[in-house]
Amino acid sequence: MNQMVFIHGPGAGGCAESFVHQLKHYPGSLAPTLPGHLEGEPCRSVERYTEWLRGWLWSKGKRQDLVLVGFTLGGSIALQYGLDYPDEVKALVLMTTGMRPRERRPGTLEFRLKAAADPETYRQWLETMRHQFLFMEPELRDHLIACHRKVGPLSQHRDFVVLDHFDARDRINTLKAPLLLIKGADDPAAQPEYEREIHEAVPGSQYLRLKNTGHFPFAERPAEVNLAIDEFLAARG
């Protein structure tokens, strides 16, 4: 029996609560809060986050048939897990995820650092987060903005640095788990098409590009994303 595991990133509140629609859709699914997102010490690399996640899952007796669904940092962790422990992973679903260091607009990291120290920049940072939620239902958007207030810009800065050092290009051809990649076609972050790069590097992978969807497909188009995951898993028994 599949064990669904949803892994969050620095966006969408920087919290596991962003997967509310998936947790309802998949009874028994899990969504850990990564260390450093209010509680615990943050990890300094995707590899260390992966080991933390594996320990967390093993402590719950979840060691096989894992379906890892990750967003941004969570997607990188899921990918690393699939590469390191292929016998434990049934399938991977990666959203807004790349296999190489991110290309960021100049000042992106500095903006988060300044937001942690300057009230006006902090306000601008929250408005930036709100703008990225333009495709999200208002109630969930407001809840995730409240999560961002708690977690704060420094946590997001640390996560960005971790992502900027992640590079799996030299191992991607060894990935064994079935792979579904999902991207919002109208992402206001205007990032490169990282998901297509992975799709082209992994034979047999599936790539879904959702229209009228931004940076957070699972929270903006939950019905479509859940259906895509259902069909992807059903096709693989």
Predicted stretch roles:
Residues G70-G74, A78:
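Gly/Ala-rich beta-loop-alpha elbow adjacent to hydrolase catalytic centers
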Residues D186-A190:
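Acidic catalytic loop of the alpha/beta-hydrolase fold
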Residues T213-P222, N226:
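Catalytic histidine-centered segment of alpha/beta-hydrolase-like enzymes
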